[in-house]
Amino acid sequence: EPLVKRNIVSICEGVAAISGIREVCLTTNATLLAPVAKDLRAAGVSRLNLSVDTLDAEKYRYITRLGELENFYQGLEAALAADFDKIKLNAVLIGGFNDDEIVSLANLTKKYPVDMRFIELMPMLNHPDFGPEAFISYERVLEALPEAVTQEADGGVAKLYRLPNALGNIGLFS
């Protein structure tokens, strides 16, 4: 989590000042973002990727090692107020953990002008927490979101979709 660094704003400012750097992006779980969002934007950070694997407060505490979901929302709101060029939310889907939240996570694109990106869990041999049943394919995401409409590719690696009345896209990574 980069925001635990007390000097993260000056680090980002230094990176943005390097000749040839066209864009500075930051990935965070957003729990520490609210107090520094405007400063990060002023330092030259143009895009954010916010990790949010669950919207259940108890599961959120578990997956982030005691993070508070409310702090994520405060960070998201602060990021929107700071007017970053693009904000993307990332969720790694895990069978038996958050696969029941596909619709609620996707619906964040109806409430906020953000993209929601679903990332397939990387297969890990002999992982103590995630067996083969933990893998959730992007086809399963589309089954949960039958109203999602295919969008034109934006040059990235995700397959893009949009829900009716959404403010952002849904990206699927496989």
Predicted segments, located by residue:
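Radical SAM/AdoMet-radical enzyme domain recognition
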Residues: 5-109, 115
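Glycine-rich beta-alpha junction loops
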Residues: 93-97, 120-125
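Glycine-rich, proline-tolerant flexible connector loops at the mouths of alpha/beta enzymes
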Residues: 1-2
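Auxiliary Fe-S-binding modules of radical SAM enzymes
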Residues: 111, 121-124, 128-174
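Generic beta-structure capping elements
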Residues: 51-55, 119-121, 173
